[in-house]
């Protein structure tokens, strides 16, 4: 029945409203703050004070496009405009008539549209339709009257003015403006241009609202009957308040309790949790304000309501941007970055995915802690760091029970409270440094925290109610897995963060450390210039580490001296530091890189070892002396290493015939095995083949090439078994100038971790038996190393 409407075109400014809708003849005031709306309002005031108002589909959109708002709205006249503080304007408008957007364009920073004004024309109705509409109008009027009588929400006086309205469209709009409507219902009424359907729509909404009001009334009556006891309690509480006031007790416990009850309504928590909190509030309301228990109860409730029960940050699921952020902050660490990007990809597909629990293991200074900060930034999550180094008390994790004086929640709950979100990135730093004592074992408490199946109902001893930790992304760091209990390690996905090679350190120094230190020392960008050769010299002669922490401090030392020089001479434009200048800035070389012996040696073999700060080369020296068959082991060797040496000698006794060794050598000779740097403790089985080869070399007087190193455990039958830390050991061999390394065949997969530029400069020989080691490394007497 759109033919019963007159249509007139207007060109008007358009304002999209957020969460509001206006009907013709309705007066409404609202605040405008967006620039696009302010410009449209200014234009309307310059024209005929007419403006077109329509509703946004989604109120959250700050910069709407044409597709973000409805195309049917209301032409309005601006009645009043008041400027408020902070670039906000309060506007009073009156609806004139409905309109529909025919054409829209955005010019000069606001929307301008051709609006088709649509006005109902009752003259075109036939007599039958008029009768039907009149019947509808009466039904709607009666329903609206019943709505007013039941609800007591609208003044009955409106019925008088409604009875005088002859325009059916205005009749509908007036009712719509005075009843409770959802946003979708308001828009549906605005967009309906069939007068009969429009009457049907408002009538059905009124009947539905009447049914709801009747049910509300029943509920209200039922509740009032149950209120007698509550009113009695309220009366007694009011009397108690008066008594407390007379006694000078100013704190109004009950008003605080009421505030807590209001807060309880707003949190999203399981029913049992809310019931427990409600009991605590009731208990709090009955405590005298003079009682010492009141502060304990208040602190507990404040802690509960300060937790982010409902708050959660929205993840940025843009893999490309996340990769850019991770690459921007860190060089290398590809395994860690790849795992986070995989998690992001799966989160994009499965929104309910639980966060992985990752353990980053590697030497100090390799970027484990800082990469976790970058992970939080890439995911758009809050970051919380908890250091577990030296933690001995289980209560540090789970909190103290409230029976103790001064009890507080554990570090987990405090971290969540600090983050004010249910899904931060949580870093447990130095998880391998926890220890147990008589107060409990914190590692056992961590079992629940780091178990995705259990941590959704984590119970802190202080709170004594479950709190969901399942949406947190937990990352732990450690220098060694050896000190982490097996059940705890089993819950984590271990990613090894290896030490950096020289080339990686060079890139990190150039791209990250030097610019960072220049900025921290308030120097101009590129004020200090250090070439690659000089940086390599700093790396090799002033630091000895798997990470880059000492390297950063060393560069910082240079920056301090340059800053002093600049203050003394402000005319300096830049400072260029060459290799020859290092002694001036840093002093004499701190480390002389002990490159491998060039010439073959008898009884001297290069071994490889792994430490918590990375791989190192280890010289094994053997002397065979006339004696009584004693085996002397020096160099502060551990029990496993001593047993490994004895295993090697037993193996040698089984092969004396192959090398023309005196079968009684172990009776007539003392064998002295020494590993230099005697103050440093050494242990483990990985020097087994190294010690065995050194003893054979000393017994046979056959040299071993100085450019060869090796690692591997030996058995009594001469088999070579796998060892750990292969990547770190091979990088240490590369730093020492070794060109050939023997490793167990079982460790072949570890070669995939070795950078290509290292592989190009070194030869890796995979061995399964000691025979292969002897063939590769034992020269004939007087033979020189051909390599």
From Swiss-Prot:
This is Lon protease. It comes from Clostridioides difficile (strain 630) (Peptoclostridium difficile). Residues 599-780 form the Lon proteolytic domain. One of its GO terms (cellular component) is cytoplasm. ATP-dependent serine protease that mediates the selective degradation of mutant and abnormal proteins as well as certain short-lived regulatory proteins. Required for cellular homeostasis and for survival from DNA damage and developmental changes induced by stress. Degrades polypeptides processively to yield small peptide fragments that are 5 to 10 amino acids long. Binds to DNA in a double-stranded, site-specific manner. Belongs to the peptidase S16 family. Keywords: ATP-binding, Cytoplasm, Hydrolase, Nucleotide-binding, Protease, Serine protease, Stress response. Induction: By heat shock. InterPro entries: AAA+_ATPase, ATPase_AAA_core, Lon_bac, Lon_bac/euk-typ, Lon_lid, Lon_proteolytic, Lon_Prtase, Lon_prtase_N. NCBIfam families: lon, PRK10787.1. The lineage of its organism: Bacteria, Bacillati, Bacillota, Clostridia, Peptostreptococcales. The gene is lon. It is found in: Cytoplasm. GO terms for molecular function: ATP binding; ATP hydrolysis activity; ATP-dependent peptidase activity; sequence-specific DNA binding; serine-type endopeptidase activity. The active site is at residues 686, 729. Its EC number is 3.4.21.53.
């Amino acid at each position: 029945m759109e033919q019963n409407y007159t249509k007139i075109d207007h060109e008007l400014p358009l304002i999209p409203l957020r969460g509001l809708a206006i009907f013709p003849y309705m007066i409404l005031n609202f605040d405008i703050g967006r620039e696009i709306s302010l410009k449209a309002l200014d234009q309307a005031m310059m024209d005929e004070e007419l403006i077109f108002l329509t509703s946004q589909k989604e109120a959250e959109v700050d910069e709407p496009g044409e597709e973000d708002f409805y195309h049917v709205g209301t032409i309005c006249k601006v009645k009043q405009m008041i400027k408020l503080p902070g670039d906000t304007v309060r506007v009073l408008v009156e609806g004139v008539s409905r309109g529909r957007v025919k054409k829209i364009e955005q010019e000069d920073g606001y929307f301008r549209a051709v609006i088709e004004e649509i006005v109902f024309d009752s003259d075109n109705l036939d007599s039958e339709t008029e009768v039907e509409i009149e019947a509808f109008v009466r039904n709607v009027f009666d329903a609206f009257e019943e709505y007013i009588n039941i609800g007591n929400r609208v003044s009955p006086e409106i019925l008088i003015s409604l009875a005088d309205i002859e325009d059916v469209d205005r009749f509908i709009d007036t009712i719509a403006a005075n009843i409770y409507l959802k946003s979708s219902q308001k828009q549906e009424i605005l967009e309906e241009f069939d007068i009969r359907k429009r009457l049907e729509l408002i009538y059905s909404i009124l009947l539905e609202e009447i049914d709801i009001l009747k049910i509300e009334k029943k509920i209200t009556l039922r509740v009032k009957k149950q209120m007698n006891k509550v009113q009695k309690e309220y009366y007694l509480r009011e009397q108690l308040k008066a008594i407390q006031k007379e006694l000078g007790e100013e704190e109004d416990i009950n008003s605080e309790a009421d505030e807590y009850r209001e807060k309880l309504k707003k949190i999203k928590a399981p029913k049992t949790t809310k019931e427990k909190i409600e009991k605590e509030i009731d208990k709090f309301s009955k405590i005298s304000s003079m009682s010492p228990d009141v502060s304990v109860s208040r602190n507990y409730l404040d802690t509960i309501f300060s937790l982010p029960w409902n708050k959660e940050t929205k993840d940025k699921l843009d893999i490309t941007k996340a990769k850019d952020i991770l690459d921007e902050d860190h060089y290398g660490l590809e395994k860690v970055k790849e795992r986070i990007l995989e998690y992001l990809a799966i989160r994009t597909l499965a929104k309910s995915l639980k966060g992985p629990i990752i353990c980053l293991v590697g030497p100090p200074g390799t970027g484990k802690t800082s990469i976790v900060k970058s992970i939080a930034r890439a995911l758009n999550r809050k970051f919380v760091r908890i250091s577990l180094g030296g933690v001995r008390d289980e209560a540090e994790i789970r909190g103290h029970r409230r029976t103790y004086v001064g009890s507080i929640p554990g570090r987990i709950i405090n971290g969540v409270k600090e983050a004010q979100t249910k899904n931060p990135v949580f870093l447990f730093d130095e998880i391998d440094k926890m220890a147990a004592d008589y107060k409990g074992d914190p590692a056992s408490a961590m079992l629940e925290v780091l178990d995705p199946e259990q941590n959704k109902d984590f119970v802190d001893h202080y709170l004594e109610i479950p709190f969901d930790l399942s949406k947190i992304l937990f990352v732990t760091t450690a220098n060694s897995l050896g000190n982490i209990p097996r059940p705890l390690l089993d819950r984590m996905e271990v990613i090894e963060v290896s030490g950096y090679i020289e080339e990686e350190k060079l890139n990190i120094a150039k791209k990250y450390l030097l610019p960072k230190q220049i900025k921290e020392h308030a120097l101009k960008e590129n004020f200090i210039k250090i070439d690659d050769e000089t940086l390599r010299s700093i790396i090799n002669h002033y630091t000895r580490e798997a990470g880059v922490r000492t390297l950063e401090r060393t560069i910082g030392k240079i920056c301090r001296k340059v800053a002093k020089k600049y203050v003394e001479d402000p005319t300096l434009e830049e400072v260029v530091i060459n290799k020859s200048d290092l002694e001036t800035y840093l002093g004499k070389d701190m480390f002389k890189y002990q490159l491998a012996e060039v010439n073959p040696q008898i009884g001297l073999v290069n071994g490889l070892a792994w430490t918590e700060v990375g791989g190192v080369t280890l010289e094994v020296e053997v002397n065979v002396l006339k004696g009584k068959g004693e085996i002397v082991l020096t160099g502060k060797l551990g029990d496993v290493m001593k047993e490994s040496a004895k295993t090697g000698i037993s193996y040698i006794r089984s092969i004396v015939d192959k090398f023309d060794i005196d079968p009684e050598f172990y009776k007539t000779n003392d064998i002295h095995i020494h590993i230099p740097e005697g103050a440093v403790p050494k242990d483990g089985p990985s020097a087994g083949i190294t010690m065995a080869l050194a003893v054979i070399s000393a017994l046979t007087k056959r040299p071993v090439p100085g450019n060869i190193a090796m690692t591997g455990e030996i058995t009594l039958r001469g088999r070579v078994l796998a060892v750990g830390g292969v990547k770190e050991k091979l990088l240490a061999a590369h730093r020492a100038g070794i060109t050939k390394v023997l490793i167990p065949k079982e460790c072949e997969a570890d070669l995939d971790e070795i950078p290509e530029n290292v592989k190009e400069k070194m030869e890796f020989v995979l061995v399964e038996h000691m025979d292969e080691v002897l063939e590769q490394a034992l020269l004939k007497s007087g033979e020189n190393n051909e390599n």
